[in-house]
Amino acid sequence: MKTLSQSLFEELDQIVLIDSHSHINPHSPASTDLSDLLGYHYYTELAHSSGMQRADIEEPNLPNREKVRRLFGFLGNIDNTVQWSWFVELARELLGFEGEVIDQSNWEIVYDLATTRMKENDWEEQVLSKSRVEKIFLTNDFDDPLTGFN
């Protein structure tokens, strides 16, 4: 017999979503590698709050893999946050990660999975389909050009 929370989750999981506030690049809306995803302010601000210096990941010409390695030196400190649970679920559901924990010992597995998956021609469509996002409304600057995307 299903619990009330299971029944509610199943019903909520059927809802098509509309993202009413997004900062994605409309000309390249899907992440292209793990540094792109973990470079989002949710993760960088939490890593900064746990001791990472801004310069550690904002160094000019820093390779993306190295940026992610440096982030993982601090992301273990945020494993009790909802943002981290989102990332782990994303790694499982979208990237095919099969583990329970992502940390300094195995982040490269996730990086390599992301590199492979995010290069697939239909990556953007896969993300939208699995996440059940139907529309995304952008948060633009007042002078951003609004051409070249739907």
Where are the language model's segments positioned?
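Metal-cofactor-binding active-site regions of metalloenzymes
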Residues: 2-150
